[in-house]
Amino acid sequence: MRTLGGFTFPCDAPVFVRVDFNVPMDEVGTITDDLRIRASLPTIESLLGRGAPLILISHLGRPVKNEQQGFSLKPCAERLSEYIGVNVPLVDFLDLDTKLYGELTRHLDKSGIVLFENIRFFAEETSKAQADRRILAEQLAPFAGAYVNDAFGASHRRHASVYELAQAFSNKAAGFLIESEMQAFSHLASEAKRPYTVILGGAKLSDKLRLIENILPTVDRLLLCGGMAFTFLAAQGCETGKSLLEESFIPEANKIIDFAKQNNVELILPVDVIEARSLTSPLGVVSKAESISYMGLDIGPETQSIFRNVIQDSKTVFWNGPAGLFENPSFSNGTRALLDALSSSSAFTFIGGGDTAAAVSLLGFDYGDFSHVSTGGGACLELLEGKILPALEVL
């Protein structure tokens, strides 16, 4: 994979930079967490500093045909303008014709940078038919002379702007964000100091099964929380009440438990939970994990203490998946306790993207409190599952 260190610019031709500005927004379109925009700045500022005219491409959300309201990248263009001190025009390029060349030239002559409107407004971007995606890539390619991918969070997709468009260029590279993400994953894979602890939460075991199978032989401790923990508790004969449970995966949970025992991996499950009658309950009660009557929605204080002690005794910690329903303040204490323990740890602390990264901001922590916070959710998991990311393979 070529990086920006070995990247050469075409004479006078713009450079496509595929960024990931898929940021959360509230109901009025205000960005609530701009981690992904800030993470793109080193690449953008470096290229601008070298005199390269930039055409940024990104997606936002999952717009459906003829429904574009709420999916415009305008707030992202405005936020990026604030960060780099240059007006970043948002260009609506739904008509890919010769008129666009003139519009792009005017904007690039003035600002040196533009942001194309949401690439997913083209149905071909996410089409399952490679021929459709290739058509879009072929329409876009003439507008630039080189291609840089810095959209780590989209690199597990075979979408036109990260896969087929990259294939259209011989002069291409990965941006600094992707480079830093891959360095962090390399650290986990080959340089992790021990004890090496992995914390996995989130809703379903089925979503993390391949990940667990891939990393279990390499770790010293596996801490399980969130909804997925109830499948393991049920496998051990615990009453899980109305908690999220994947009964069909209980045999898989038993296999993981047995493998951990045979390979001296310490597998730690919650010993107490915060349970409530519904997801919107204003208050939960502490219950022992083996006898839950209603819905377990967070780890309890005893489990928080156990997990905290394990983190303090670790040299490397990877965490993906919240400990509970952290969006509800009544069930956020477990996730907050893990963030607090990790932020004060001297270990190499890696926060897997998605909901876990969102919890950092929502619960009042700073991304700089941790060694690495990934900008990728699905991409992060697929790398840890041992998969090759398609968009990086074509770089």
Curated annotation (Swiss-Prot):
Keywords per UniProt: ATP-binding, Cytoplasm, Glycolysis, Kinase, Nucleotide-binding, Transferase
Entry's EC annotation: 2.7.2.3
Functional pathway: Carbohydrate degradation; glycolysis; pyruvate from D-glyceraldehyde 3-phosphate: step 2/5
Binding locations of substrate: D20, F21, N22, R36, H59, L60, G61, R62, R120, R157
Lipid metabolism recorded as keyword: no
Reaction(s) catalysed (UniProt annotation): (2R)-3-phosphoglycerate + ATP = (2R)-3-phospho-glyceroyl phosphate + ADP
Positions of ATP binding: K208, G296, E327, G353, G354, D355, T356
Residues forming coiled coils: none
GO molecular function: ADP binding; ATP binding; phosphoglycerate kinase activity
GO BP annotations listed: gluconeogenesis; glycolytic process
Enzyme class: transferase
Family: Belongs to the phosphoglycerate kinase family.
Assembly description: Monomer.
Protein name, as recorded: Phosphoglycerate kinase
Organism: Tropheryma whipplei (strain Twist)
Taxon lineage: Bacteria, Bacillati, Actinomycetota, Actinomycetes, Micrococcales
